[in-house]
């Protein structure tokens, strides 16, 4: 049986955090050992420097996706960014692949619509942070690999969005207020 998206992501995150050598290859593993994947602001600074170093070497996303070890690197780093958001905002995280996310969106639509997820690489990994915020961290990688320092701004904007969406409106029905608090 194929592991779920969450199992695959959590496996990658486990090896990043514990610094244990995984039974599969992750590109630039030696360099990743120098990053403290401890959900601190320092970890984001180290991650930004890692991406800046890759940009100086002109390493682009298609090159990384050309082999499995590069794919593991890309997914692991994107997953850490989304997991960082969830952990630092105190929210639960759920992971979806393209098919699962498409089905989730179809269930949430109250009215039949033609809107769908684009069929592209960036939609292949989506994190639901809390109950309402969806994050596609793979979309951030091209800018990071071009040397753009967009990670702090992305984290700040997404953190604000997560906090706004997790607030409980006390003017709602008592059941909705209770559900809002229990969901946290």
Where are each of the predicted segments found?
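Sequence-level detector for tyrosine residue identity
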Residues: 14-15, 39, 80, 84, ...
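N-terminal low-complexity, intrinsically disordered segments
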Residues: 1-76
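A recognition module on extended beta-rich or small alphabeta surfaces enriched in W/G with H and D/E
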Residues: 105-184
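Aromatic- and glycine-enriched beta-alpha-beta binding-site module
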Residues: 68-109
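Short, Lys/Arg-enriched charge-dense amphipathic segments
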Residues: 62-64, 84-94, 120-128
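Generic structural signal for hydrophobic core residues of well-folded globular domains
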Residues: 51-54, 84, 88-89, 144-145
């Amino acid at each position: 049986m194929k592991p779920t998206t969450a199992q695959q992501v959590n496996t990658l995150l486990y090896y990043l955090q514990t610094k244990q050598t995984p039974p599969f290859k992750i590109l630039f593993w030696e360099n990743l050992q120098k990053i403290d994947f401890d959900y601190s602001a320092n970890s984001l600074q180290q991650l930004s420097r890692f991406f800046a170093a890759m940009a100086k070497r002109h390493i682009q996303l298609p090159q990384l996706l050309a082999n499995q070890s590069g794919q593991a690197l890309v997914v692991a780093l994107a997953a850490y960014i989304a997991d960082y958001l969830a952990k630092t905002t105190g929210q639960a995280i759920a992971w979806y692949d393209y098919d699962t996310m498409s089905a989730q969106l179809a269930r949430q639509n109250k009215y039949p619509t033609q809107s769908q997820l684009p069929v592209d690489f960036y939609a292949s990994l989506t994190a639901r942070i809390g109950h309402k915020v969806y994050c596609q961290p793979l979309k951030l990688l091209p800018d990071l690999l071009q040397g753009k320092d967009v990670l702090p701004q992305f984290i700040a904007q997404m953190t604000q969005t997560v906090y706004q969406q997790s607030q409980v409106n006390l003017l709602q029905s008592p059941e909705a207020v209770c559900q809002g608090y229990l969901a946290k």
